[in-house]
Amino acid sequence: MNRPAPSLSLRLFHRLDVWIQRKRIELLRRRFAGCGRDVSIQWPVVINGADHLQVGDRVSINAFVHIWAQGGVRIGDDSLIASHVAITSLTHSLTGGKYSESCLHLPIEIGRNVWVGTHAVILPGVKIGDNAVV
């Protein structure tokens, strides 16, 4: 079955989309504590504390991911963060059952070749080993 060639406007739209993606990565790369090669970030995402986020090589972060990295977040090489994932390295301190407005910052480590599935929540202080599926 022969398909017609994509229209010029569709090809231009695709090229523009690819260019915008590259520019977003370049801008984020400057803000991250570290960013590897061949990183893919689909939009929209929310990243707070980007200067405490380290992303390895060939990492993919999908749309609607929220990352609160103020306590430090490290994502290892070849890892995939599926859509709608929440990663938070800060929480409120609970002392004797009493709520405190002060925040507790605990680093998160996501190993190499990790797949974090859709709607997962990674909480402060969590360490996920290499080759894991969450």
Regions found by a protein language model. Give the residues of each.
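Terminal amphipathic alpha-helical/low-complexity segments used for targeting or macromolecular assembly
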Residues: 1-38, 78, 92-94, 113, ...
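Flexible, glycine/small-residue-enriched loop-and-beta-strand segment within the central core
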Residues: 45-55, 60-127
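Binuclear metal-ion centers of metallo-dependent hydrolases, dominated by the metallo-beta-lactamase
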Residues: 134
